[in-house]
Amino acid sequence: MNDTVEKSIERAKVLIESLPYMQEFRHKTIVIKYGGHAMVDEALKKQFALDVILLKQIGINPIIVHGGGPQINNLLDRLDIKPSYVQGMRVTDGETMDVVEMVLVGKVNKEIVGLINHCGGKAVGLSGRDGDLVCAEQLQMNQAQVGDNPPELIDVGRVGQVTKINSHVLETLSQDDFIPIIAPVGVGEDGRAFNINADLVASAIAAELSAEKLILLTDVPGVKNKAGDLLTTLEWQELNGLIEDGTIMGGMIPKVRCCEDAVKGGVAKTYIVDGRVEHAILLEIFTRDGVGTEIY
């Protein structure tokens, strides 16, 4: 048996291994937060597009929510607009919000849609303002309490939190075999735009749709223990203890909280996955061991 035949047999085995998962998840919704290095590396960008198209072709319903922080910062630098942060949160005034919406909706979203369509898929770009898809209000943040003084409210401008997801537009697009690509810009009651963390939008959409899975693509392998080993599965009830003892810290805390909210909202399973790994989405969905950290 020559090498070519052996390689073909291995490919066939991979397909057979994935068959039960294809059958299990057919007609199910999977929400994917697309961000990090996977959005800027050209090879990974194309692999992501092809992976999403494959999901749609085999009957799975993928919904994509994307980030774009580095692209926003690049344009702010070019316009000589100095960003300011409070407790790690970008303060978004009216001028900054214009840039955020311009980049997320007008550039990043269209590039993702264009790539998927170029690769043979049917993608449609949306922002949370379209069809009032993502309704929002201003995020409330408090300064740390000092002594007996009550904590003061911090004005972070047009930074929003999700109040409601109007899922009808997503359901309609999915039924017509389109892949929705969503920019995380929400709309307030007064019609103003709000900048919302993409993880939060993805989590809220997944919960509203009772999605089978929520996958957050990141630039780390997943949640690790204090020894640096990957924690492959976690129950959401374990998260508070891991945060309190310092196992989970920094930017990983809001990500696991998004997963917790999604599970409490009816999502079957959530995942924090290293988007730098080739075909990370397919490995998570269609292999026994998966990749990253599963939170359920």
UniProtKB/Swiss-Prot annotation:
Its EC number is 2.7.2.8. HAMAP family: ArgB. Catalyzes the ATP-dependent phosphorylation of N-acetyl-L-glutamate. CDD domains: AAK_NAGK-C. GO terms for biological process: arginine biosynthetic process via ornithine; L-arginine biosynthetic process. It is found in: Cytoplasm. Keywords: Amino-acid biosynthesis, Arginine biosynthesis, ATP-binding, Cytoplasm, Kinase, Nucleotide-binding, Transferase. Pathway: Amino-acid biosynthesis; L-arginine biosynthesis; N(2)-acetyl-L-ornithine from L-glutamate: step 2/4. Substrate binds at residues 68-69, 90, 195. Belongs to the acetylglutamate kinase family. ArgB subfamily. It catalyses: N-acetyl-L-glutamate + ATP = N-acetyl-L-glutamyl 5-phosphate + ADP. Its main location: cytoplasm. This is Acetylglutamate kinase. GO terms for molecular function: acetylglutamate kinase activity; ATP binding. It comes from Desulfotalea psychrophila (strain LSv54 / DSM 12343). NCBIfam families: argB (TIGR00761). The record marks 33, 255 as: Transition state stabilizer. The keyword Transferase applies. The keyword Acetylation does not apply. One of its GO terms (cellular component) is cytoplasm. The lineage of its organism: Bacteria, Pseudomonadati, Thermodesulfobacteriota, Desulfobulbia, Desulfobulbales. Pfam families: AA_kinase.
